[in-house]
A protein has these predicted regions:
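A short, surface-exposed beta-strand/turn
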Residues: 54-64, 110-129
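A short hydrophobic beta-strand element
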Residues: 35, 95-105
Length: 129
């Protein structure tokens, strides 16, 4: 878990989600393994309430000497009525995948945009970070 505190009293929390199946090996003799994981960055207020989030999901292959991201996707949530997702995208390069999102906060004084990104990476031995 990674936590970053912001100047306005809010903070972001990034976690790797473990609910996805780990290794999918096509054959017991296969030298290349496949792993799918997701990683989420939550934007929370000082009380710990999730205001919005962005998730990157990546599928990787690895063989002990190299690793590669073969596909990725992103998702967003904005459970707070004061927040809405303005834009979101994802990209992959080598053994990493990144999701980027911008959310808009609406208050009585107007609107303000906040941006976050989350990157997931797989090592040659299948360690996801």
């Amino acid at each position: 878990i990674q936590i970053e505190y912001l100047e306005n009293g809010d903070y972001t929390e990034t976690v790797i989600n473990d609910e996805l199946p780990d290794n999918v090996v096509i054959s017991p003799f296969a030298t290349t393994k496949t792993i799918t994981k997701s990683k989420t960055t939550y934007y929370k207020n000082s009380a710990g309430t999730v205001l919005w989030s962005v998730t990157i999901k990546g599928t990787f292959t690895y063989n002990g000497s190299t690793s590669k991201c073969t596909s990725c996707s992103h998702s967003t949530t904005a459970p707070s009525s004061a927040w809405s997702i303005k834009s979101a995208s994802h990209s992959k390069s080598g053994n990493t995948a990144t999701a980027r999102a911008t959310a808009t906060q609406t208050t009585s004084t107007g609107t303000k945009d906040f941006s976050m990104s989350v990157t997931i990476k797989c090592s040659a031995n299948g360690t996801v970070s």
